[in-house]
């Protein structure tokens, strides 16, 4: 399978060198890095080229790398049932960059792009209805960004007495611990009760 994917990667590089920044086969999967400006063209090529025929959009997601200048990777997964192959496209963007919508090529991208917008705050130009899909309309922030607080900003619950949904500030039962996820982990400097070793 890896040979077939390498062959496909070479074919794509020959046919669409203008779109591809780099490609590799890792863990039996073909990964292609594409510039945002060439994304729609390249996705259309993947669908229509007789050697590719990637007619099924499986998923769109994103990955947050806060330490990088190009903070987000928008990741597209496609399937060719005709060739029995999968491909992953990655588009790297800065926090305030926008990604062109592929809904004209794959209408099924509509809700995927809305989900990425809702969870990461990434905007898609040309999207027919870019609004939140999973969180409430008044929701503040983007929950899958690494700088989003683990507790969130508000607590949402149904109040039986008022017979409606109420929003309240988050109240934690235990003290909130702030973790620095951006620094390498060095281990805890303290011993919790029950962690001490018994003298034998």
UniProtKB/Swiss-Prot annotation:
Compartments where located: Cell inner membrane
Source species, domain of life: Bacteria
Enzyme Commission designation: 7.1.1.-
Topology in the lipid bilayer: Peripheral membrane protein
A GO cellular-component term linked to this record: plasma membrane
Gene3D superfamilies linked: NADH:ubiquinone oxidoreductase, 30kDa subunit
UniProt keywords, alphabetically: Cell inner membrane, Cell membrane, Membrane, NAD, Quinone, Translocase, Transport, Ubiquinone
Record keyword Membrane present: yes
UniProt family annotation: Belongs to the complex I 30 kDa subunit family.
Quaternary data: NDH-1 is composed of 14 different subunits. Subunits NuoB, C, D, E, F, and G constitute the peripheral sector of the complex.
Official protein name in the record: NADH-quinone oxidoreductase subunit C
Organism: Ruegeria pomeroyi (strain ATCC 700808 / DSM 15171 / DSS-3)
């Amino acid at each position: 399978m890896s040979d077939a994917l390498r062959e496909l990667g070479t074919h794509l590089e020959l046919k669409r060198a203008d779109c591809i920044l780099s490609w590799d086969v890792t863990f039996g999967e073909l990964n292609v890095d594409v510039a945002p400006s060439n994304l729609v063209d390249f996705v259309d090529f993947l669908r229509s080229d007789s050697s590719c025929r990637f007619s099924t959009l499986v998923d769109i997601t994103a990955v947050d790398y806060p330490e990088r200048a190009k903070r987000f990777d928008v990741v597209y997964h496609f399937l060719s049932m005709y060739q029995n192959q999968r491909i992953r496209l990655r588009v790297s963007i800065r926090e305030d960059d926008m990604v062109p919508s592929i809904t004209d090529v794959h209408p099924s991208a509509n809700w995927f792009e809305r989900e990425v917008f809702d969870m990461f705050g990434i905007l898609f130009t040309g999207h027919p209805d870019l609004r939140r899909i999973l969180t409430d309309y008044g929701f503040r922030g983007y929950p899958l960004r690494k700088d989003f607080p683990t507790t969130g900003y508000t607590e949402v619950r149904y109040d039986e007495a008022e017979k409606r949904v109420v929003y309240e500030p988050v109240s934690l039962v235990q003290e909130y611990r702030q973790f620095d996820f951006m620094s390498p982990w060095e281990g805890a400097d303290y011993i919790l009760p029950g962690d001490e070793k018994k003298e034998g």
